[in-house]
Amino acid sequence: MQLTVKALQGRECSLQVAEDELVSTLKHLVSDKLNVPVRQQRLLFKGKALADEKRLSDYNIGPNSKLNLVVKPLEKVLLEEGSAHRLVDSSATPIWQLISKVLARHFSIGDASRVLEQLQRDYDRSLSRLTLDDIERLASRFLHPEVTEAMEKGFCK
């Protein structure tokens, strides 16, 4: 069936999908057509937000239907994802497990635990204080190291 997805900024695209297609799959198609990252998309049908795990047929979306696309600001997405990560026990992530093993080699169990907890708090605090400018600078350094190196050499002379 043919669907039209219209962003609030005025861009729109037509997509060919199956009636029982997952909303998450539709978001990937929209991402390809409109160049909007999936995690920044919120699709609406008749004013109702569509859940990723549901199918288009669950919302009675038929041929020639029109869906609205709301693009969430990246800052909001990052904040939401940060909150979700805090709900998960951060000590379960592989990097924290690895750090825990290293600390255990050099400290008693109690001291290693306290150092790990403080390190996690400091890490979370540092991440929460990053601005978009900070993130842009970091990304530029990773993506264009030759420019950063040239700038540093220029400033050192």
UniProtKB/Swiss-Prot annotation:
The record, for Gene3D superfamilies, names:
Phosphatidylinositol 3-kinase Catalytic Subunit, Chain A, domain 1 (3.10.20.90)
> What sequence ranges are listed for the domain Ubiquitin-like?
1-76
How is the protein altered post-translationally, as described in the entry?
Answer: Polyubiquitinated. Ubiquitination by AMFR and deubiquitination by USP13 may regulate the interaction between the BAG6/BAT complex and SGTA and therefore may regulate client proteins fate.
Q: Which UniProt keywords apply?
A: Cytoplasm, Isopeptide bond, Nucleus, Phosphoprotein, Transport, Ubl conjugation
- In the UniProt record, does the keyword Nucleus occur? yes
PROSITE patterns referenced in this protein's UniProt entry, alphabetically: UBIQUITIN_1 (PS00299), UBIQUITIN_2 (PS50053)
A single Gene Ontology molecular function, please?
protein-folding chaperone binding
Question: Known SMART domains for this protein?
Answer: UBQ (SM00213)
Q: Where is the signal peptide?
A: none
Q: What InterPro entries does the entry give?
A: Ubiquitin-like_dom, Ubiquitin-like_domsf, Ubiquitin_CS, Ubiquitin_dom, Ubl4_C_TUGS, UBL4A-like, Ubl_UBL4A-like
Q: Which residues form the Glycyl lysine isopeptide (Lys-Gly) (interchain with G-Cter in ubiquitin) crosslink?
A: 48
Residues carrying Phosphoserine: 90
Compartment list: Cytoplasm, Cytosol; Nucleus
Domain of life the protein comes from: Eukaryota
Identify one Gene Ontology CC term for this UniProt entry.
Answer: BAT3 complex
Query: For this UniProt entry, what is the primary localization, expressed as one broad class?
Result: cytoplasm
How does this chain assemble?
A: Component of the BAG6/BAT3 complex, at least composed of BAG6, UBL4A and GET4/TRC35. Interacts with BAG6; the interaction is direct and required for UBL4A protein stability. Interacts with USP13; may be indirect via BAG6.
**Function summary:** As part of a cytosolic protein quality control complex, the BAG6/BAT3 complex, maintains misfolded and hydrophobic patches-containing proteins in a soluble state and participates in their proper delivery to the endoplasmic reticulum or alternatively can promote their sorting to the proteasome where they undergo degradation. The BAG6/BAT3 complex is involved in the post-translational delivery of tail-anchored/type II transmembrane proteins to the endoplasmic reticulum membrane.
Protein name, entry field = Ubiquitin-like protein 4A
